[in-house]
């Protein structure tokens, strides 16, 4: 629940309220509330502004996940799939794109400007297995580079996960993280 709340917005609301309270208290000569409003309100407001400026919004599920896939996720999803899903569906601060460290480590875009941008997230069933599908906008990194790194991605995302890469549209890459039957046995 808390992962869906923007700390920047909370800071702006609380800081704005306290700062406004400080100005009103100053106008009515209430020194105690005036000090509280200024000493706490202005820093919280500035902190909220700073967080809002560096905020990376959660990636939406498009379309929303059906209940059958949610129960499949609970049964078959690997720890890595769950971690990726949880990381990209919450607010992040101080980074330019979701999964930036993972993409850099895998060699998909060396500079921040080259890193693909994650657009949407889907969960579905593929051949009875849970699949987490990430759709990237990848204008700087062609499909060939993604395909060269496919084996490295399979190792990176851990045992029990098969990686499939497909180009949907020009500059649009679909990365599917699919559980394998080894996950059920192991």
Task: List each model region and its residues.
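Cytosolic juxtamembrane segments of membrane proteins
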Residues: 60-90
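Short low-complexity stretches enriched in small and charged residues
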Residues: 84-94, 129-134
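An N-terminal amphipathic alpha-helical segment
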Residues: 66-75, 93-130
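A general structural signal for well-ordered secondary-structure junctions
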Residues: 33, 109-112, 159
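Short, surface-exposed ligand-recognition loops at beta-strand->loop->(often short) alpha-helix junctions
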Residues: 90-97, 138-144
């Amino acid at each position: 629940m808390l992962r869906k709340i923007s700390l920047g917005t909370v800071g702006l609301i609380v800081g704005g309220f306290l700062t406004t309270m400080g100005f009103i208290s100053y106008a009515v000569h209430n020194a105690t509330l005036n000090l509280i409003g200024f000493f706490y309100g202005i820093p919280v407001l500035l902190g909220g502004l700073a967080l809002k400026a560096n905020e990376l919004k959660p990636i939406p599920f498009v379309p929303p996940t059906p209940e059958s896939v949610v129960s499949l996720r609970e049964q078959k999803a690997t720890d890595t799939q769950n971690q990726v899903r949880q990381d990209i569906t919450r607010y992040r601060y101080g980074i330019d794109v979701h999964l930036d460290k993972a993409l850099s480590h895998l060699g998909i875009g060396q500079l921040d400007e080259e890193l693909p941008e994650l657009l949407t997230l889907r969960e579905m069933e593929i051949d009875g297995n849970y699949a987490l599908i990430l759709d990237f906008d990848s204008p700087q990194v062609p499909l060939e580079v993604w395909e060269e790194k496919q084996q490295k991605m399979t190792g990176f995302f851990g045992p029990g996960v098969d990686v499939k890469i497909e180009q949907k549209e020009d500059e649009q890459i679909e990365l599917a993280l699919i559980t394998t039957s080894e996950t059920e046995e192991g």
